[in-house]
From Swiss-Prot:
Keyword Chloroplast recorded: yes
Organism: Cryptomeria japonica
Compartmental location: Plastid, Chloroplast
Any one Gene Ontology cellular component term annotated for this protein: chloroplast
Protein name: Maturase K
GO MF annotations in UniProt: RNA binding
Lineage: Eukaryota, Viridiplantae, Streptophyta, Embryophyta, Tracheophyta
Family matches, as InterPro entries: Domain_X, Maturase_MatK, Maturase_MatK_N
Purpose of the protein: Usually encoded in the trnK tRNA gene intron. Probably assists in splicing its own and other chloroplast group II introns.
Gene transcribed to yield this protein: matK
Alphabetical keyword list: Chloroplast, mRNA processing, Plastid, RNA-binding, tRNA processing
Amino acid sequence: MGEFQRNENKHKSWQQFFLYPLFFREDLYAIAHDHHLDRSGSSEPTEILVSNFLSFLTVKRSIRRMRKQTNSISLFGNSDPNKLIECNKNFYSKSILEGFTIVLEVSFAMRSKHFIEGMNGWNSLRSIHCLFPLMEDKLPHSNYISDIRVPYSIHPEILVRIFRRWIRDAPSLHLLRSILHEWKNSFSRENLQKALITQIENTRFSLFLWNSYVYECESFLIPLIKRFFNSQSLLYGSFPDRTHFDKKIKDIVLFPRKISTKKIWLLKDSFIHYVRYGERSLMALKGTHLQVKKCRYHLFHFWQYYFHLWFQPYRICSLQLSKTSFSFLGYFLHVKMKPLVVRVKMLDDLFITDLITNELNPIAPIRAILFFLAKEKFCDISGWPISKLSWTSLSDDDILDRFDRIWINLFHYYSGSINQEGLYHIKYILLLSCAKTLACKHKSTIRVVREQLGSELFTKSFSKEKFISSSFSKTRSQRERIWNSEISQINPLANFWQKMQNKQIEN
């Protein structure tokens, strides 16, 4: 009886790796069908949506055909001259792809859950602003930073090899291979590799491929880096009494006589911190220039030999924090030395000494924000506010609410920057653009609009309750910053500026 239970448990554990029974469940494709309808909304004609009914028998037949690469259905393109039939096939193929993605997501979630449970000290936070307090604490103690852009030029067979680690059934792998190779034939050779990750039409499948790829990278890369920096030590540089601290190390740590105290500093005081958002990763290092070069060397060879792809040199850049600034999540980040006056009392004597500390200064890119506002027709190139003509057909409340949301989102995202005066200038531009838009709609002047609306223009739009008052801003310390914990994604303005930075680096 015990042997039978062991065999049954073994059969259940092996069955978790087989996904093909889920492909023949009708409720799975019903969920995918409803998900696709929710995403499409009312953008498609009603007659096309009505004609797309879900057939369980046709789903099974289509999957059986998709397993054969020589006779697979088209998931990413149709050449049928009948527009209605073409839309139906395209819509139905997307439903199959959504169902396949749901199956992979469930299996991936189970695998990643066990991986996260096995890691000690793993914290998952939703807000991206949780990265900035971490960098405020850790970056001032670092002297080098490596700005890494995760490469996305990966071959489809490498993705199949990644999934083969936790998918044991051949039909699911053949289905995935046929989808990826059909995707490969649907794009030009130049845009193929980027389309595998950043294709717009199949967002759910694309995001799943990207997350799986990044998960595979970090699951091997982070332990490799931890092995390279084998010990996480205290920040000895933060202690004023450095001489006596070295003497304590000498008494505690056993080391050969040939190694001097300076070499102990290099060996024991090395640490690394890693953060990532999207394709951008930052590794802050406390060590020597030789250690940074070795880490860069290992990163190059990791992607070259493990993923069989060429890692472009511009995708990893090592900077010295005390000399240069870098951009991340729409901020300019710069570590600046700050002197502190400290009073030390010894017996009856009082001494005044100076301490040099490092402080992280996040700066909002005001020029990039002005360029974006000029592109969206809120102001001209010189920063002079203009009316938003495309919004004149809206009601007054909608116009005020739209300007209000733009400003609130912008200020909440850049609330931790040190150049708050630039944000006040952006507020002035949006306020005048809002007034000019209302004046253009009512065919009047800004003065007439302000007289008609009165304080409503300033209370409903850009309300003072949602903005930090000037009295509080003056009384608070310059070292204190307010990071909004409700920011779950990068601001569109910051994302636009970040894409401009990436294009400049690639060119």
